[in-house]
């Protein structure tokens, strides 16, 4: 099984290096699983980038030089870049799993063994708070599609999770206990550290535009109570909601997504 990990930076070298430390600590358990090969990638969005020299030979860094330092978070686009860089093609994927992570993730010591167990049971998996850690497979992307880049900051993970339980309910495990979005709960891969006030000074800039993403969520799903803690009838409700028009952004990749027209894509 070939796994590609993609860590997204957020101008926080301390958090990133702690992520890498706990990630690579888990490699000590590689001998407990068979035929698992792991490649670690970092998608860096800022010029003030630095990692511990110990990890430099073991990671591939993709520098997003087109994004200026004064820009705010664009998580949906970054997750899509990870999926596309990772699989390269849905028809002939280059790996079995794309595992995405925010930079302040703290991995469980046996996260590799847990990942194998998760993959044996599910095709899409989300852990902890929102999109902190997500496991994608070629099958999950074919059925759910890519992330909606109309969500620039906030609510994009809520949209993706609703699409997961709409298009692939049995093969999805969502463990977003922080927001009350839980579906087919399973074991945990990681956890988020205690909040660091200095980190959120930068994040507050992005919060100014959060209302735009909220408007997009309401446009797509039409109800406030589908965001945050899910109602008991969440799956029944999402099945009755017609998809809004969407645009294909990456035709060389997205045309292998199943039933694009049924998902509302303009063809």
What residue spans do the PLM features occupy?
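Conserved donor-nucleotide/metal-binding helix-loop-beta segment in metal-dependent transferases, i.e.
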Residues: 109-128
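Active-site-proximal specificity loops/subdomain of glycosyltransferases
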Residues: 48-95
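Aromatic-glycine-rich donor-binding/catalytic loop that engages nucleotide-sugar donors
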Residues: 138-154, 163-169, 173
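Cell-envelope/extracellular polymer assembly enzymes that use nucleotide-activated donors
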Residues: 2-4, 39, 159
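Short, well-formed alpha-helical segments that are part of the catalytic scaffolds
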Residues: 12-28
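C-terminal catalytic/acceptor-binding lobe
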Residues: 19, 158-267
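Acidic donor-binding segment of Leloir-type glycosyltransferases
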Residues: 23-67
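Short beta-strand-to-loop acidic/aromatic patch adjacent to the donor-nucleotide binding site
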Residues: 92-106
């Amino acid at each position: 099984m070939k796994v590609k990990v993609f860590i997204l930076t957020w101008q926080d070298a301390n958090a990133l290096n702690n992520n890498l430390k706990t990630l690579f600590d888990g490699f000590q358990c590689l001998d407990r699983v068979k035929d698992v090969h792991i490649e670690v990638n970092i998608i860096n969005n800022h010029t003030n980038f630095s990692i511990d020299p110990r990890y430099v030979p073991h990671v591939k860094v993709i520098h997003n030089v087109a994004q200026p330092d004064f820009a705010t978070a664009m998580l949906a686009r970054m997750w899509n870049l990870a999926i596309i860089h990772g699989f390269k093609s849905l028809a002939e994927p280059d790996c079995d799993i794309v595992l995405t992570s925010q930079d302040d993730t703290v991995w469980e010591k046996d996260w590799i063994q847990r990942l194998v167990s998760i993959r044996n049971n599910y095709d899409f998996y989300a852990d902890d708070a929102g999109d902190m850690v997500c496991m994608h497979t070629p099958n999950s992307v074919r059925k759910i599609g890519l992330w909606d880049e109309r969500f620039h900051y906030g609510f994009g993970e809520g949209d993706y999770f609703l699409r997961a339980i709409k298009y692939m309910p049995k093969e999805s495990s969502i463990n977003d206990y922080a927001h009350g979005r839980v579906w087919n709960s399973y074991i945990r891969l990681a956890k988020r550290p205690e909040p660091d006030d200095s980190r959120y000074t930068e994040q507050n800039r992005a919060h100014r535009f959060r209302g735009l993403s909220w408007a997009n969520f309401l446009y797509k799903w039409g109800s406030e109570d589908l965001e945050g803690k899910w109602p008991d009838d969440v799956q029944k409700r999402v099945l009755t909601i017609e998809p809004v028009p969407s645009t294909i952004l990456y035709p060389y990749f997205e045309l292998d997504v199943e039933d694009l027209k049924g998902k509302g894509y303009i063809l």
